[in-house]
């Protein structure tokens, strides 16, 4: 046979080699696999989703590989709604909730099965197991997920064959599955909204994963402090790499693009180039989070004096942000409006900016007009979980306009950013950026700061750096 590949050093495949490759392989089926730790929690989440859409078929894909360049792909990351509902992270999968005539749904999962040794695909395919690693068999997946599993290669035909069932699918994740079903865009959006709604309150297992993520992140920040002196001779990249090493060692990776911003880069909200110099006397704003192997992420920010101590002006700005964060954190408790922490922090920053003469007062009027936003830029926090900006599609009345409940996890992250080219502030203020961010869980009687292991006040930061700086 001939199987020509452009510019391959092996442009042909002989029948003899093909026959040789198909024989002599051991049976590696694993019969010792137990259900995943999160499987019973995922079953409860599916039941909650089922209750929202009686009589309708629901399709939640995991997603496909995305090309980085040529034949190189990005590391795969499953759609968070799929992970939440299944505990699975495999590519090319899909959860289907099939409505039962008597109510409720039957759940099953489409998976990409193992490559057969009866043809050449297992070693010649673009993503063949012999090249990229062993996948789980369908039987293995059933044992791990606690769900019936089917071959995803028949999914499009299966779904298209039962076209009379009213169906919703999460759009933009798997084009082939999306093309196989006839759905309504507005109704599909409601499914995605519901998947976000159901992540607003974390269960006990999720909170445990978030604690792991934050604890690893605390260790990663300590690693960075120990490498500051080396980074002065290199760049922000050295510190980004230092944190990434911890993330890979203890978790899956980083949960989002690390912001490692020294000097005036600290005034750029989402600086991820991380290629600038690290200079003594400047501040380093590090916004980073470890993502666990279950894909839950931390999101923590500290602003550090590279020399180990704040200058008087740096400390003045830092203290203003710290006090604003304290005001925001104090509001986090069950029954409080979600917006309370944001409003408390922003009111404090507006008052300080009026006091400094950078915006026109009185402070309450400045806040009501949003004048502080020239220097605060973003909102003061967000939900946290499988995504760094978790529950982004949740209904507004349940999220931003909702009230806090035990089990919710959110960040509180006020900041002040005086751009290097901002002529409305004195020259010595320009290029100073400060943000402090912590991860909080709402408890029955208040809140728990998961990231309390990292110092926050200026004095605490300086003492911590003196202890760990290399």
Curated annotation (Swiss-Prot):
It catalyses: Release of any N-terminal amino acid, including proline, that is linked to proline, even from a dipeptide or tripeptide. Mn(2+) 1 binds at residues 299, 382, 413, 437. This is Xaa-Pro aminopeptidase 2. Pfam families: AMP_N (PF05195), Peptidase_M24 (PF00557). One of its GO terms (biological process) is proteolysis. It is an enzyme of class 3 (hydrolase). Its EC number is 3.4.11.9. Binds 2 manganese ions per subunit.
């Amino acid at each position: 046979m001939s199987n020509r590949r452009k510019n391959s050093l092996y442009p042909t495949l002989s029948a003899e080699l093909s026959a040789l490759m198909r024989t002599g392989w051991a049976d590696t089926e694993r019969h010792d696999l137990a259900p995943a730790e999160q499987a019973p929690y995922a079953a409860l989440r599916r039941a909650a989703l089922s209750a929202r859409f009686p009589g309708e078929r629901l399709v939640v894909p995991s997603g496909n590989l995305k090309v980085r360049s040529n034949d190189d792909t990005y590391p795969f990351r499953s759609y968070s709604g799929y992970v939440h509902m299944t505990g699975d992270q495999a590519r090319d999968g899909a959860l289907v909730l099939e409505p039962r005539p008597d109510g409720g749904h039957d759940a099953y999962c489409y998976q990409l099965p193992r490559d057969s040794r009866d043809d050449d695909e297992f070693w010649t395919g673009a993503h063949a197991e012999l090249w990229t690693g062993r996948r789980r068999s369908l039987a293995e997946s059933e044992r791990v997920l606690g769900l019936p599993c089917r071959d995803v290669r028949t999914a499009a035909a299966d779904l298209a064959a039962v076209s009379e069932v009213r169906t919703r699918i999460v759009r933009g994740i798997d084009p082939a599955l999306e093309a196989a079903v006839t759905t309504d865009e507005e109704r599909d959006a409601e499914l995605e909204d519901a998947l976000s709604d159901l992540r607003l309150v974390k269960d006990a297992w999720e909170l445990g994963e978030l604690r792991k993520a934050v604890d690893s992140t605390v260790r990663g920040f300590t690693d960075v402090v120990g490498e500051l002196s080396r980074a002065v001779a290199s760049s922000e990249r050295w510190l980004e790499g230092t944190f990434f090493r911890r993330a890979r060692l203890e978790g899956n990776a980083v949960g989002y693009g690390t912001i490692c911003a020294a000097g005036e880069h600290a005034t750029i909200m989402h600086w991820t180039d991380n290629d600038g110099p690290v200079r003594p006397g400047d501040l380093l704003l590090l916004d980073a989070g470890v993502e666990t192997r279950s894909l839950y992420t931390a999101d923590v920010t500290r602003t550090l004096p590279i020399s180990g101590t704040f200058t008087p002006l740096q400390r003045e700005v830092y203290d203003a942000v710290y006090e604003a964060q304290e005001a925001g954190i104090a509001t986090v408790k069950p029954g409080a409006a979600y917006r309370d922490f944001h409003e408390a922090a922003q009111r404090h920053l507006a008052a300080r900016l009026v006091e400094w003469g950078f915006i026109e007062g009185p402070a309450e009027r400045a806040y009501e007009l949003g004048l502080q936003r020239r220097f605060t830029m973003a909102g003061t926090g967000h939900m946290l979980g499988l995504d760094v900006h978790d529950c982004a599609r949740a209904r507004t009345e349940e999220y931003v306009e909702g009230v806090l409940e035990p089990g919710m996890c959110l960040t509180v992250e006020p900041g002040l950013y005086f751009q290097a080219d901002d002529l409305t502030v004195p020259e010595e203020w320009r290029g100073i950026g400060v943000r402090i961010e912590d991860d909080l869980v709402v408890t029955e009687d208040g809140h728990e700061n998961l990231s309390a292991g990292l110092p926050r006040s200026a004095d605490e930061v300086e003492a911590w750096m003196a202890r760990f700086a290399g």
